[in-house]
């Protein structure tokens, strides 16, 4: 379809001329890593805390942008027209990796800190399973991009920490002190509850292990992927409501009636990706039935023909359009269409969502990137920063990379 080719071309333009240059500009050459805060008014705080999740995600992003370049998805000529060379993408990934290795990873107790001061010294020494997972995700992709075996060794050290320190017999635990004593999970709890276990952490451990398995085919990692899929299907997925539950007690009883629209559409394609990487027919059959249902349900209840609402908490819909939810919507519906081309409505939804993003979510101001969130009518919400520990190129950059890889441009 010509519309899909146009989508891929526009995603490539957004990646090359906007997202990559913006995040290259956030590089801190004095203290390492990337600056941690840019306000809505585009005021850079060079002394803001540096979130380790943010730096893992930036490293992942540049590693995958380089892999896209290496695979021919973007050309040297296209890079140079945007003001950089293809090898500059690997240089950025190396810069991020060096910061992770030298500052974010705790050399005394192992694992990765939650955040650092601007100068690379520890600030919040919480060890969170979610955070360990994103570092594995970054290190695995960086290993693929750079061939650096030390990065792979670090990824496996974090894998071992998660499996030895951050699990019980039924799932993944969440938050720990620096020396891995359990603590309460405020960091991954929202909506007025305090969760012992979360869908979000399980999903992103799965995502990280998928990438680690992709680059190694390690049998132990593959077995954990299967275990996570069973846990997801048996504990997290709610077949009656055709959605994931989000927050749980220690025994995986749900503690809040919450439908996270963005996580459901993201999970649908990430689970499909994991099934493809694992290449196990039993799990393909088991999980595909669920991911098809998640995609269909989100299309029915959360997509208004143009964009995706945020969530529904105890029957009340939050209609804000959040940057990461919109980005995952494009990939999720494109994935749904690719796996069943009879569902042309998913293709139309991905195209319509991109129109909404480029019209309202992409910030046209010089020196900015994407708005954090906009109202249902597309007007920006003015108090949300452009960069902070959670606001990163992982969702929107990945959307562009996925669109280019899936469609070609």
Task: Kindly give the residue locations of the regions a language model identified.
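Glycan-recognition and catalytic cores of secretory/periplasmic carbohydrate-active enzymes
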Residues: 1-409
